[in-house]
UniProtKB/Swiss-Prot annotation:
Protein's UniProt keywords contain Cell membrane: yes
Domain GST C-terminal as annotated: residue spans: 81-244
Family listed: Belongs to the chloride channel CLIC family.
Task performed by this protein: In the soluble state, catalyzes glutaredoxin-like thiol disulfide exchange reactions with reduced glutathione as electron donor. Can insert into membranes and form voltage-dependent multi-ion conductive channels. Membrane insertion seems to be redox-regulated and may occur only under oxidizing conditions. Has alternate cellular functions like a potential role in angiogenesis or in maintaining apical-basolateral membrane polarity during mitosis and cytokinesis. Could also promote endothelial cell proliferation and regulate endothelial morphogenesis (tubulogenesis).
Residues modified to N6-acetyllysine: 24, 130
Domain statement: The active G-site contains a monothiol Cys-X-X-Ser motif which mediates glutathione-dependent redox catalysis. Members of this family may change from a globular, soluble state to a state where the N-terminal domain is inserted into the membrane and functions as a chloride channel. The redox status of the active cysteine in Cys-X-X-Cys/Ser motif likely determines the capacity to adopt a soluble or membrane-inserted state. A conformation change of the N-terminal domain is thought to expose hydrophobic surfaces that trigger membrane insertion.
Modified positions (Phosphotyrosine) in chain numbering: 244
Organism: Mus musculus
Protein name, entry field: Chloride intracellular channel protein 4
Motif (G-site): 35-38
Amino acid sequence: MALSMPLNGLKEEDKEPLIELFVKAGSDGESIGNCPFSQRLFMILWLKGVVFSVTTVDLKRKPADLQNLAPGTHPPFITFNSEVKTDVNKIEEFLEEVLCPPKYLKLSPKHPESNTAGMDIFAKFSAYIKNSRPEANEALERGLLKTLQKLDEYLNSPLPDEIDENSMEDIKFSTRRFLDGDEMTLADCNLLPKLHIVKVVAKKYRNFDIPKGMTGIWRYLTNAYSRDEFTNTCPSDKEVEIAYSDVAKRLTK
């Protein structure tokens, strides 16, 4: 999955940086594997509109040249003009700083609340899916639902820039497509891969569906599934299910 562009004849400052993203491979050793951190960086680079290449890394057969490139490091990581960077949060900050306007899109959210929306969902989901005690299942499911409800309320609450102070109309519900508005931001790159895992895994191993009444979340997911930046960086549902086959505990008496 390599994208390239000829650099001949360009000034130094106009040249695209040489970026390679290394992500976790799927069960076949080649396709995109289940890793929300890999997808997060994949989405950021895609949204930035920068030329980059992608290498899937089979963790069972990690090539020697990769061992030398980033010893002891699991994907995701990047090389940026041959410099290896391995910390996902720092990579995000670095890319936002160096791939900046006017040449590249700014992806930081305008509203600080967008950065923390849904941040506790994945922890509640993990506790729910790893539990093997039937008597604890209901309480853990309620805990997950509570965090999903909180996200749903945020997505349905109008952002300040959706409210026109000069308008007589009272806007009660947001119609925005993503967390921070109608365009994806870093906050979406962080949350959407995790939210997708929750949807797929909870259905497969607990027959749990995100309630249809959570219209904000379903609007959000529907909009995400319509975007190449999300769907083309996403592992298949089967890969997600395989990744959780040993993690998801059966409820046993």
